[in-house]
Amino acid sequence: MTGLLRNPVKNYDWGSHTAIATLTGRPSPAERPEAEMWFGTHPSGSSSVLRDGTWRSLADTVAADPVGELGAETVERFGSRLPYLLKLIAVDLPLSLQVHPSREQAEEGFARGTYVDPFPKPELICALTPFTALAGFRPAGEAAELIGGLGLPALEPFVAPLAAGDVSAALRALVQWPKEGRAELLDAIARAAAADGGPDHELVVRLAGIHPEDPACLAPLFLRRHDLRPGEAIFLGAGVLHCYLSGFGVEIMGGSDNVLRAGLTGKPMDVEELLRVTDPSVPPLRIEPEGGLYRTPAPEFRLGTAVPGAGLTLRGGVPRILLCTAGEVEGGGHALRPGESAFVPASYGPVELRGSGTLFWAEPGTD
């Protein structure tokens, strides 16, 4: 049986007072910043599903009948857990600079107590509004030229390894930068970047205003910038250093909390594990939808989107979350309006969609 969902909102400081509230038809601006709305079974915030007039945790519902809710194939591949987490994400302030481990790294790290779970955390972000992110390294020589162009000899411990093509050594120098003199250095970086005036340098100035003692504010000069238009998406696999800067979008990821931070945060950093996991050679991937599906290398998830019109049929046999972001869409026995969602269990069979609105759906990927 399908069921409407009620979903938790996460009030992180970097979130928006308006984006999620407006989409879901609640009073806007919200009193507190709303960063994310979660759709799924995550232990830190499971959705609730309406069945037979009663709201029940979706996580408990899945645990009570894994094969019926997830399907035998999904259980065989991922165990008795929904392998993905779907989100609305609203970014008003930059997130931390971060990276996630591969499946093998997560399993090994969990066994030795480094990670909180044994799962990878690949991510796909699809823009609903213009969305800006930093992801993947620029060529080392290009980064050395940009940062060296600031004309600050104090940055030589970072610039020199970049110029030599040793990105890992440069990253180590950055995250282990001496505490003494950081405020003065960041002030000099901000002034030099402001004098240049280019868009990436303007981002450096913005980050330095938020994190006035963090040399990771140089990230716009050593990472690639991605400006996504609505409907455009980027996939971030294991080892890809990244940071969301601004915008509103639909995000889907592997169900994991494994995060390694490299800066732009006051949270602790595991430097050695960060350097072991970060892979400068792995680029982010721009993903174009094929037949409405954003196909990625991640087996945990696949994101779909469509304006169904007179009719669209999705195959059955997989656990699927439906999310309307505009207009009205009928699917799984429900008429969904913006911000409304439903869970369709694997046992339901094919899902008939119709309507002039915009629908996103989440389902497991393929191996």
Q: What function would you assign to each model-found segment?
A:
Residues 1-196, 266-284, 303:
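Transition-metal
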Residues 38, 98, 125, 227, ...:
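Structured core elements
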Residues 67-73, 213-229, 315, 321-338:
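A short beta-strand-loop-beta hairpin characteristic of the jelly-roll/cupin
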Residues 88-94, 101-104, 117-123, 127-133, ...:
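Ligand-binding loop in jelly-roll beta-barrel domains
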Residues 197-255:
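Acidic, glycine-rich loop-and-beta core segments that form the ion-binding/anion-interacting portion
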Residues 223-236, 240-243, 306, 331-350:
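Short acidic-glycine-tyrosine-enriched beta hairpin
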Residues 248-293:
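C-terminal, non-catalytic macromolecule-binding modules
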Residues 299-317, 335-338:
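Conserved short histidine dyad/triad with adjacent acidic residue
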